Amino acid sequence: MKQLPEKIALDKAVHGQRLYQGSVEIQKMSRLIDLLADADGAISFSIEFERARGLLGKAQVKVSADLSLICKISQKKFMFPVEIDSTVGFIDDLAYEDLLDIDMEASWVEEGFIKPLDIIEDELILAVPDIPFNEGHVDDSKEEDLNVAEKKPNPFAVLKNLK
């Protein structure tokens, strides 16, 4: 498999309607690592460049990964599956931001080049929840609290007899 280039000339990628796909190790994403429990694993991706009216171009970005997060409730590690399918519009002037479709994310282009790994990493960072929570986690302490509450006699039960 061909390695993902560090930088891509955007105009060539757009006019050639290039497709980059493959996988990359999570360890190569320094900003994302700070949000994860560990940097094990790989990410599958696909970036397909297209022409876009009024913009420098756009890309269909698809990313698939299992990210290792720490549940804020249980403080245990869990795998968070991520499936991303988004459209990124490339701009080099804020005036073009209004030309982006409503469902399109903006990506700033400097000197005509983009870094595809940064685009993938940006998408993953946006997918990580602010407060990671393992939905499959059952909090044992809450279950015990419910059982204790059920076993205690209701102090108002005696009022029932006063009628």
Could you say what each language-model-derived stretch is?
Residues 1-17, 92-163:
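Charge-rich, low-complexity linker and terminal segments
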Residues 1-64, 68:
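A positional/architectural concept
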Residues 24-26, 49, 90, 116, ...:
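Hydrophobic residues in beta-strands and at strand termini
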Residues 27, 39-43, 65-67, 79-82, ...:
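Short, low-complexity, polar/charged sequence segments that are solvent-exposed and flexible
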Residues 28-30, 51-55, 71, 75, ...:
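Residues that cap or initiate secondary-structure elements
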Residues 36, 88-89, 138:
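Short amphipathic alpha-helical leader/targeting segments
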Residues 58, 66-98:
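Helix-adjacent hinge/juxtasegments
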